[in-house]
Amino acid sequence: GGRINDKTHYRVYGKWFTRDDGVFSDGTDGADNWYQGRGGFRIDWEPTGDDLLTLQGDIYGSNEGQTYRADPENPATEFSDAIHANGGNFLGRWTRRLDAKSELTVQTYYDRTDRDLEQFVETRDTFDIEMDHRFALGSWNSITWGLGYRLTSNDVEDTATIMWDNDGLNLQLFSGFIQDQIAIVPHKLLLTLGSKFEHNDFTGFEVQPSARVSWTPTSRQTFWGAISRAVRTPAQSDRDMKFTVDTDKVAGLPLVFFGNDQFDTEEVVVYELGYRVQPTDRVTMDLALFYNVYDDLRSLENKGVSIDPLPPHIRVEVDNLLGARTYGFELAGTWQAMPWWRWQATYAYIRLDIDPAATSTDTEREEGDVPRHTIMLRSTMDLPGHFEFDTGLRYVDALVTQDVPSYLVVDVRLGWRPNPRWELSVVGQNLLDSQHPEFASLFTVQRTEVEHSVYGRVTMRF
């Protein structure tokens, strides 16, 4: 990067990496090695003191291996394939300062993605334009509003396991939002009200309101609470995909998943409470509690043996017959033990309760699909001679229904900064076990396990 003149700066970059195979539980290679190369640029130009123009773009290409089993229970049906992905994007953004309390931003974006693998082939083009305007209304209100439009065009191909009712779609998304931050008591009591509005081609008009309040009685304490609604609108795969993934062990027939052209929006209402306190100059603590209520979640409904279409198969349809609740809390703390030694710790607890509709036949969604307890501890030291020594510990509870046991991970880093331009470091990751699983196999894709590793890094800044 560098400076073209007093008003124009630029940056270019290039990256390339390669990763070798993961391993299966028996220690054999998983044929999921991958590599990626990418490059890009960014230019920032200030033609006037009130204007900033940004142009940036990226291109990339990658190849990622995967191991499949046509029948997950039969090793003889195992085969390997690679995901070939490439694409690029371009972004242009203009920011105009209208006055000391008002700013206008207009941004446009284009993205092209090509993905090609054994089971899925897609080319996707996305064009997006949006406008944001921030201004003050009196001394109490700070208002931000905006409008947006997105056009997505894709082409998909039928494969041996995935077929589509539509081999290409042009989908439009119109959006807008408004938010008002109200200083009820300046610097003490803030109320933020807002909503996002969208219109999509699948489910029509969607509203996502939110409200947040924060109270700062002293410079060392803040209480806050929030309530919001969010949605996930259908994807093409929810509505018009047919996916053959397995063989039913009882009937001996293929399992075929069908999209549902009546699949509707999934929604969640989120309730949050929080407290932040700094009891001493060296200690900071945060507590956040949450309760989420989900409705119309995607379910996979077993319709039994079907001959439409032939040959005979077990028909499974996508529907909206699940509800759920998640609740829990997260406690985080930071302790500056010495000017050169810092500790950070986090504990999170989450509980998931599934509530299927009375007519649902989905038995695959389980309450053990999330880790109930997660603990993280991190130490960072700035040592004499420009050395740095960092250690991290992470515990993740078991995913019972996915047959993933709990695991404990330790990472260590030793770094040296002889001057501001150079950094040399060596890092060890997952040092306690030679390997461990962190996720389950997904349909026919076979999981590999995370291995311990050591790598070195050299960074030069100029």
Where are these regions (language model features)?
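Surface-exposed extracellular loop regions of Gram-negative outer-membrane beta-barrel proteins
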Residues: N5-F24, Q36, A70-P72, K101-L117, G168-T203, W215, R220-V270, ...
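Gram-negative outer-membrane beta-barrel transporters
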Residues: A183-I184, K188-L189, F290-Y294, L310-L399
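Membrane-embedded beta-barrel scaffold of Gram-negative outer-membrane proteins
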Residues: T8, K101-Y109, T113-D116, T216, ...
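Repeated loop/turn-to-beta-strand initiation elements of outer-membrane beta-barrel proteins
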Residues: K7-Y10, D50-L55, L98-L104, W140-I143, ...
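Outer-membrane beta-barrel transmembrane domain signature of Gram-negative proteins
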Residues: D71-P72, F79-L91, R96, Y110, ...
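Transmembrane beta-barrel wall of Gram-negative outer-membrane proteins
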Residues: G1-T18, G27-E64, A82-S102, L137-G138, ...
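Conserved C-terminal beta-signal and adjacent last beta-strands/turns
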Residues: G1-R3, Y13, D44-E46, G225, ...
